[in-house]
Amino acid sequence: TDRRVSDENPKWLANTQDSVTSITLLRELVEEIGFSPDGKGSLELVNEEIQEKICIDKEKWAYYVKKGEIKIDNFNSQIIAVRTMPPFAPIRFTNTFHHLSIGDSKIEPRFPKGMSEFDEYRWWKPENLLQSWLNHEVRLPPPQVTLIRDICESLEENGDLISAFDKLSINPSEGYHILEFAPGVECIPLPTQTLPPATHTNCYVLGVPGGERVIIDPAAKSKEALEILSKKIDEIRLSRSEIIATIFTHKHQDHIG
């Protein structure tokens, strides 16, 4: 839908890095929290009826843009990070994280009636969110964990959020990042001869940098898998951690290395 809308309206959001991605972002913003550009570089809350109709029919987003009831002029976003999930399955997902400013509007998200993916929202300082995750008080998907770490690091270096996001947007982080399902639980997908359609076995590293570590199911046999595992072991040692145990959960050939 969004690609077709972009093809049919090539001037829409042509000033952004990727017009298709920007159209998807703006449509999803309306659907999920009722936000849309205000035409002045900030965001506003759209009419609730418009939000509901777009939730029912995605085609309606372009319809309301053409009618002028949804604005896209002067829309600005900063891409601050890109995360591509490791090969858990044949289809991999890429997450692109944007920074959008709401300025002084003080708008509050509004979830669609009866069809929201969310239970609640909260404005959260990055450092407090990271600490809450470390304390097992909230759960975060792995891509968001490394994103929050990047934001906290940039915030410490640059002093305020706007400066932190400006710095991150210059060279958005992407490529290799550790995959943490929980504090002290890191996953390393290793290519193995496992049962199709799977292509990898999940090796786990337990523990935190500087502390004792345990490796579970390091099923590396191929050159590629051995290189991945070797780099991870070097990374662990550089963090001044000690590997105190290796555990194999069972004797299947795709779990033994």
Where are the predicted features?
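Conserved Nudix-box catalytic region and its N-terminal flanking loop in Nudix hydrolases
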Residues: 1-55, 134, 138
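Active-site-adjacent beta-strand/loop module that shapes the phosphate/pyrophosphate-binding cleft
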Residues: 49-108
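NUDIX/MutT-family hydrolases
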Residues: 74-81, 94-103, 110-138
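Short Pro/Gly-enriched beta-strand edge/turn motifs at strand-loop
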Residues: 77-81, 182-191
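Amphipathic alpha-helical
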Residues: 156-170
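Conserved beta-strand hairpin/beta-sheet module of binuclear metal-dependent hydrolase folds
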Residues: 185-236
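Active-site metal-binding motif and surrounding structural segment of the metallo-beta-lactamase
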Residues: 225-257
